[in-house]
Amino acid sequence: MGVVMKYSLKLIIVVFIAVVIAACSSKPAEEYKAEAKKEVELKNYSKAVKIYDELADVHSGSKDASEALLEIAKLYHSKLVDSLDEKTSYKKAFSYYEKIYLEYQNSAEAPNALFMAAFLQGNELNNPEEAKKLYKLFIEKYPDSEMVNSAKMELENVGLTPEEILKKNTPQPKK
């Protein structure tokens, strides 16, 4: 029993030291942000995504992490990341928006992320049923948001062509 206890104690000490070293060696979030912004300015979008992703991993659960995830989503949504076709870029953007509203529900970025996820589903990924579900969730979760009226309007028009929306919203002449 004594040998097992000594071994267990040594293992606990080694793990503790490793955790402390890892925690101390991580860069501050501001340093990651500055590096990522520099890469965006240089139009090195893939590199910026990697830096923001690392920030989100290292500072997981923080405000900085949710902000970094939103920046990644916006880069993919804007189709700025090289070597991706449009649909793949939109799907990547959606996955980051989704991660924000699922894992960072109380963050300042969550309402915008949920709205944009719905918008992408309805307007870019041609999935009106998923868009409706997400717009309804947005309206339910964020009834006081300044974007709630936009969500309601999108919900009414999702899946319609521009011509159908115009026809629906234009008074028809009396016969």
Regions found by a protein language model. Name each.
Residues 2-11, 20-175:
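Acidic, polar-rich low-complexity tracts and alpha-helical solenoid repeat scaffolds
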